[in-house]
């Protein structure tokens, strides 16, 4: 192989090896935090107010950087986060809610630094 061919081959080889190692990374290293379970579920129609809201993600989240906000018929509702029970879960206490439609907005950070924002709607009452 000529010296010129070696110079051309190295970058291709390096790219192939880089791609190979990227594929070998565990999914959690590359994953954005995606909600895999919520209580209540999106668009739920509840007869009574839920005592708390739960969001479970597909990966660990940085609890200290996460936020949730609940908006109802009478405006914003304080929803303090509970201490973490598991690295992939967020729980927030909810005061008794009056009948109406509620919107939960959340913002999480995963260990890879990616931000995930989302909205969950539910209805309380008939």
Language-model regions: role of each:
Residues 2-20:
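Bacterial N-terminal signal peptides that target proteins for export
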Residues 26-28:
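N-terminal signal peptide c-region/cleavage motif recognized by signal peptidases
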Residues 38, 46-48, 52-56, 113-126:
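Extended, polar beta-sheet/loop recognition surfaces of beta-rich domains
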Residues 53-78:
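Short, surface-exposed alpha-helix to beta-strand junction/turn motifs within ectodomains of secreted
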Residues 93, 98-107:
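A glycine-anchored, Pro-Gly-centered beta-turn/N-cap motif
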Residues 88-92:
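Short strand-edge motifs at loop-to-beta-strand transitions and within beta-strands
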Residues 81-86:
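Short beta-strand segments within Ig-like beta-sandwich modules, predominantly Fibronectin type-III
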